[in-house]
Amino acid sequence: ASLQAGPEAGYRPVTPRLEDAFIALLGGGPGGDSTLAALMPDHHSTLQQGPVIEAQGLTKRFGDFTATDQVSFTVQRGEIFGLLGPNGAGKSTTFKMECGLLRPSAGQAKVMGYSLSKSPGKARQQLGYMAQKFSLYGNLSVEQNLRFFSGVYGLRGRAQNEKIARMSDAFGLKSIARHAADELPLGYKQRLALACSLMHEPDILFLDEPTSGVDPLTRREFWLHINSMVD
């Protein structure tokens, strides 16, 4: 199934929802600019021209069951691109193939021009992945999770310590640095998971249902961070 581009982005009035009324009662929720934008490098001049994410006929079979069937789409630089569908539609499976966590039964996945099958190391270095269940190590502290994920991508010594400090400030994690990840409320787990996925300053960020189960204020704060990073 080839995904076609949607209409041009724009604004139109909509009927307020219950969540909107709730946010208004709390003073309007988070606003302004995210501090995260100042911490992330400007990739505008280094990103390649053309699609930065490509799915070409991606198919995944588990025995006799076909989870995805000939999925094709492209994502351009600066786009926030989403996959919509019911549970079991194959969204997470598609994400995992694009991140190199699952090998396709057929088709090809590319990130920044690198094939996940031919150059998996180079492709993975370009991307960050925030999984649906956050993929944190529950028995490790907040700081230890940040140190582990940054270390996986080669950050060491002073550079690593400085990045941990900056991310902890940006996401409000300093006061809970020694708390185990399993002890955190869902909203803080979300903040930590996003921070971990950004430690190596990736060009591309994959988010698998990142706001599922969190409260409206936390959800809006999350998208404030995401929108601040768009070129």
Describe the function of each predicted region:
Residues 1-2:
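N-terminal accessory interaction module
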Residues 53-231:
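ABC transporter nucleotide-binding domains
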Residues 6-10, 14-60:
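ABC-family P-loop ATPase nucleotide-binding domain
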